[in-house]
Amino acid sequence: MEFSRESCEYYRRAYALAIRILLENKKLRFPLTPVSLNMILDESMISRKQEPGILEIPTNLIVGVAEDSEHRHLYTKDFLPVSLPDSDYADQWCRLYQVLLSNADFDKPISCYEYLGKFYVCDGMKRVSAAKYHS
């Protein structure tokens, strides 16, 4: 799917906002990347897991990632993208954003964990990034 110049402009805006937020947060010593659930919750503390199926989750309830990985460093704590605008990542983000601009749904749901009413992404961080910026 070819993406539009408009969706790429949105990426450049999201990227510029991300860099500004990173610089401000660094000065204030706030966390720079999304929180990782495995830093909050030890596996031994989990009494049960349940598969609720596919749910619609408001983007404001998605607050972090399930596991600490190198991918979480591609985002600000609010999932704004920090990869350079001429990267493969930016091209993929633009394609996802184009889906949102056309009022279509993503072809694949994200997977995540819920803990205390907040959601932590396992798979689908780019989709979350595009959706959070779009909302």
Feature roles, as predicted:
Residues 1-116, 122-126, 132-133:
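Short, charged/polar connector segments at secondary-structure boundaries
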